[in-house]
Amino acid sequence: MDSKHSMISLKQKLSGLLDVIPKQSEIIYADYPLYGNVGDLFIMKGTEAFFKEHGIRVRKRWNPDNFPIGRKLDPNLIIVCQGGGNFGDLYPYYQGFREKIVQTYPNHKIVILPQSIYFQNKDNLKRTAEIFSKHANLHIMTREKASYATAQAYFTTNHIQLLPDMAHQLFPVIPTQQPSNQKLRFIRTDHEANQALQEHAEAESYDWRTVLSASDRRTIAFLQTLNVLNKKAGNPLPIAYIWEKYSDYIVQKAIRFFSRYESVETSRLHGHILSSLLQKENTVIDNSYGKNANYFHTWMEGVPSTRLIQHASKKENLPAHM
């Protein structure tokens, strides 16, 4: 199967979501990302594209900073939580928000979109499982086999599915220009970085923070502050609409940036996914706890022009299936 048909196939797999969010459903989008992690914005744009394609009506869009916890909701609304890689104890703010939603709305169907699950502390995993076990209509979408196995083992009373990342809904993504540079090294610099694997690629590398300008970062910080103040005033301002438009600009900026390069080497999962959506040759470097490798082995292994660096002894960038 060539790269194009591989991407089409992954997009088609997302139709499995319709089993739990049927066409024409009315939903609450509970925790859209209002921050500068551009990978999460690609997830959000894919999610919104999925809703639009299937006639799913979003009644309200909130985020963890302005969700009116405790507000009475129409019992027919499905509460939908953002997918990504922040399910676990590495990101307690977002994990805590999801748990609060599950506890506050025991009679609503709740769907967590495709997530990677990772807990450093098993006690934290057990505590989350205890909270989730009390909800009879909670559906957890996992985005790779390791997370699926964890969910099956610990969230035994919940409904579990395995689906690709929501960003695949965006295919095809059209490059904005012909490449003028050879290889982009797009390397993460935060606590998920795997230094042993990516040190060879860190020279002259970029990350989402360098794609965003100082002006972009100031605008995001301003909107985050405005979002909090807006909640205190009863949410009169259309923050979700303002952010939709501004995040469109950020996502297009990222597409333009990646379009300038022939190939990509990255330790960002969405650097890998965006490169694949653009049908660029790309190498993904595993992160600190195996998220990237797990995703690659679940969905991307065998996709032409994609490679994995998972072990320090295999930095020769050979295809993972060779």
From Swiss-Prot:
Membrane-spanning segments: none
Family listed: Belongs to the polysaccharide pyruvyl transferase family.
Function: May be involved in the production of the exopolysaccharide (EPS) component of the extracellular matrix during biofilm formation. EPS is responsible for the adhesion of chains of cells into bundles.
GO molecular function ontology, one term from the record: transferase activity
Induction record: Repressed by SinR.
Enzyme class label: transferase
EC number: 2.-.-.-
Organism phylogeny: Bacteria, Bacillati, Bacillota, Bacilli, Bacillales
Keyword NADP: no
Any one Pfam family match given in the protein's UniProt record, by short name: PS_pyruv_trans
Record-given protein name: Putative pyruvyl transferase EpsO
Keywords for this protein: Exopolysaccharide synthesis, Transferase
Coiled coil: none
Domain of life assignment: Bacteria
Biological process, per Gene Ontology: polysaccharide biosynthetic process
Xref: InterPro entries: Polysacch_pyruvyl_Trfase
